[in-house]
Amino acid sequence: MSRCKFRSLNYSEFLNLVEKSDFEEVVTREHEKIMAQKVDGTFNESMKLENRKLNRYLDMLCFDHTRVTLPAEKNRGDYINANYVDGYEYKKKFICTQAPLQQTAYDFWRTVWMHHTRIIVMMCKKKENRKQCFAYWNDIEGGDIVFGKFKITTTQIETHLSYIETTLLVTDGTSAIQEVTHFVFTQWPDYGVPNDVMNLLNFILTVKSAQKDVIRQLAQERFKIGDNPPPIVVHCSAGVGRTGAYCLLDSAISEFDACATISIPSTLINIRNQRYYCIFILPQYFFCYRVMERYVNLTVNKVSKKLIANVATALFNKVLHLKDN
């Protein structure tokens, strides 16, 4: 099957699309084409007998070519069900992974530590439909939890309408210490979509703002490990649906801010080439369009108001100048 190609849309083309009467039909066909497109990749490490127990779901495997490889330790392999995923601004902006299991929590923190990660985004609740995300951090302020050499201390918790922001201090038994901000979005049900577009949009913009703060702080510290900022670790339950949607929307917002274009289908194809099976549920794909529709409208309105204000100021100054003369 030939590979699908989709062109970028400018803001007016995008808004015309989402306002069309056959929008759902058009996007359904688009999603079907993306799902049918063959993705090249192998899953040899995921399918090894010793690694199968480290996968939360037997059918949610991890590409070999983009997988995170952990440093080997005694009685510990290098495998974790996690993949690097590019963002719009730079490569390997994200590490997309499954919710930690009891037997993988230590590997999760090894991943965070080795990449100097400063932000974790959790797109699921601790408990959903009787499924439990293993408690890999302590949700009591002042509490701590230990996994192997890592001690994770909770120093601050802020509860908001649709998310929880927690500050964690991570140590590895040496004098080194790493501060991590842990964001949990609480309004996205498994296999469903949030009830409110703005809740998710505000959450994504909040995390993007936090990442900008991290980049500024690292610049002040003259951080020199790698060419790019530390990756953001993103997970839900399987690490493909809500996780994929988060990465798609983050990238789409960055693209629109930089170029005033929107490339939702091609962005999803790029993500799926790096993390297997992302956004395979159609309603989640629709919802990404609705979030971007809101963001584009808000941005265009803000720009329009600014232009109107600038024109009004220019006219006012011109009138004053004429009066003075």
UniProtKB/Swiss-Prot annotation:
E.C. numbers: 3.1.3.48
Principal location class: host cell
Keyword Glycosyltransferase: no
Location of the protein in the cell: Host cytoplasm
Keywords for this protein: Activation of host caspases by virus, Host cytoplasm, Host-virus interaction, Hydrolase, Inhibition of host innate immune response by virus, Modulation of host cell apoptosis by virus, Protein phosphatase, Viral immunoevasion
One annotated GO biological process: symbiont-mediated suppression of host innate immune response
GO terms under cellular component: host cell cytoplasm
A Pfam family per the record: Y_phosphatase
Residue stretches making up the Tyrosine-protein phosphatase domain: 27-295
Cited Gene3D superfamilies: Protein tyrosine phosphatase superfamily (3.90.190.10)
Listed name of the protein: Tyrosine phosphatase H2
Keyword Hydrolase: yes
Active site positions, chain numbering: 236 (phosphocysteine intermediate)
InterPro entries membership: Prot-tyrosine_phosphatase-like, Protein-Tyr_Phosphatase, PTP_cat, Tyr_Pase_AS, Tyr_Pase_cat, Tyr_Pase_dom
Catalytic reactions on record: O-phospho-L-tyrosyl-[protein] + H2O = L-tyrosyl-[protein] + phosphate
Superkingdom of the organism of origin: Viruses
